[in-house]
């Protein structure tokens, strides 16, 4: 009889003991970059594109995501670099209406989040891009490299 009670007491103690907290972790799963295609210097409307990034977190992380400036000296506008000395102004946005520039949350920029995703759930985040119309730039390839940082 004493053995049964002792075993029962250990079981109850084990059930009441706190589990150690699991460290939060997050990572990007995929990033689909933006491709603006051919830019028409005579077009009256901006050239638009969209991409997305996907991330997964565990351990109850609350997430924000920032984007770097890229090649430009500031967020507004960013630059796509082309032939020597040429750049094409563009920007990346948090919303399809292009109201909030996606940056690091300083100045004129916003950032994604905070968001508390479900544990181990993949979250897709859209990225919206726009090249303003009316830029007289030389023919050639233009590109920029942006770093996305997930903070948790």
What are these regions (language model features)?
Residues 41, 95-97:
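Residues that form or immediately flank small-molecule/cofactor binding pockets and catalytic motifs
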Residues 68-70, 91-95:
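Predominantly extracellular/luminal cell-surface or secreted proteins
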Residues 1-4:
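Positively charged n-region of N-terminal signal peptides that target proteins for export
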Residues 7-15:
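Bacterial N-terminal signal peptides
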Residues 22-84, 114-152:
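N-terminal small/polar-rich segments of proteins
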Residues 29-30, 101-110:
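Short beta-strand and strand-turn-strand segments in soluble, beta-rich domains
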Residues 18-20:
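N-terminal signal peptide c-region/cleavage motif recognized by signal peptidases
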Residues 85-92, 99:
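Extracellular/luminal ectodomains and secreted, surface-exposed scaffolds of diverse proteins
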């Amino acid at each position: 009889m004493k053995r049964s009670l002792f075993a029962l007491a250990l079981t109850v103690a084990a059930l009441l003991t706190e589990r150690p907290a699991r460290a939060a972790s997050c990572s990007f799963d995929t990033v689909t970059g933006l491709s603006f295609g051919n830019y028409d210097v005579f077009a009256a409307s901006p050239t638009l594109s969209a991409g997305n990034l996907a991330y997964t977190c565990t351990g109850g992380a609350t997430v924000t995501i920032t984007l770097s400036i890229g090649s430009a000296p500031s967020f507004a506008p960013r630059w796509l670099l082309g032939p020597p000395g040429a750049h094409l102004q563009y920007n990346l946005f948090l919303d399809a209406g292009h109201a909030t520039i996606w940056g690091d949350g300083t100045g004129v920029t916003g950032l994604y989040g905070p968001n508390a995703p479900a544990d181990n759930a993949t979250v897709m985040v859209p990225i919206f891009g726009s090249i303003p119309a009316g830029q007289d730039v030389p023919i050639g390839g233009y590109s920029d490299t942006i770093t996305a940082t997930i903070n948790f």
